[in-house]
């Protein structure tokens, strides 16, 4: 695998691709899909993510104390799934993630504060 990686990096470099842009001057915290549907162990899609939620809560405290941007994402579908595209056919178990249900809300242990964005992805 290392040979593949090195050859890919060399190919990218020869084409002027793969440069780094740095970290910028204002970091943001993006919390992806820490909704009840995934973090609640009683959910059909859930697991034991207590440790991950606890670590995320610590990160949230740091970002909020520093007044840095925090953005959450969740997966949510309309009841008729017209917004689901073909992905719902690939992963039909996601059909329990309906807009307005408890399962698509962000876990209360890291709940968004007023002004923090929640992006619904499909």
Predicted regions and their residues:
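Alpha-helical scaffold elements lining the catalytic groove of polysaccharide deacetylases
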Residues: 120-122
